[in-house]
Amino acid sequence: MRSPKNTTQMVGLNVVYDDDDMPRKQEQGQRLLERMTQYAAAADIHMQTQVRVAANIANGIRHAYKEFRATEILIGMHMHPEVSQKFWGEFHQSLFNGLNSQIIMARLTQPLATIRRIQVAVPSRAQFEPGFYRWLERLCRLGSNLECHTEFFGREDVLPLIENYVLSRHHDMRVSYTRMAHWAELPSLAASISADNLFVVVTARKGTVSYKNALEFLPDEITRHFSGSNIMIIFPDQHGDAMDEMTFAQPQHTEEHSAYEAIGKWIKKKL
């Protein structure tokens, strides 16, 4: 998802609660970050790591984000109901409501390298978001690097813009475009998603140009129709499209703050 010309380092972040279990969680977090560093090194990417202690996980991530002058966040979605019954987990809503930068949330049930198809649901008016081309560039690079077919679903006003961008920047990419007249058609896409597919949903924050009330039902729709699928959810950047840096933030604990539901663990062997 990252440009090979980009030499800016990644940051691997693990935030743990400041409680009696902190020493053990710090040790676990450090071991996880060491594995992440090895994966990054195998791809010739330098990664700086930090285990951070915080009373509030979302605030801990936000403070680290500012300190490292990061440009976006990639964070895991949990798959463990014993951790949290909520789709968004306990702190993620506070995170994406508190940061206007691009946030990518992912839940992978298999190594990323084994993905054979990417399907992307794009909401109406997505082209008017400042970060439209940022997430599009990320997905184009992902599809090209995995050498898998990418299919974009969206309305007739946004698909030509995506097609023009792909033709001009990633003309060798295997790609197709399918009209999705209304967001209510989202559940119907589940029938075409296989176990080795990645389903990507481009969503929106409340108050932004592409936000719609139907997005409030996204957690229920994903839980009901895409529960076993590899999922990626993208909150577009609200500042622009400087397409270069990415930060990795790995959640380890949850806290109360939610209106959606699932997210917490990813990245161990997914890169």
Regions inferred by a protein language model and the residue ranges of each:
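A short, well-structured beta->alpha microelement
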Residues: 47-48, 52-64, 155-156, 172-192
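Non-transmembrane accessory domains of multi-pass membrane transporters/channels
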Residues: 1-33, 41-48, 125-130, 134, ...
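Active-site-proximal loop/turn and secondary-structure-junction residues that shape catalytic pockets
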Residues: 16-18, 53, 79, 156
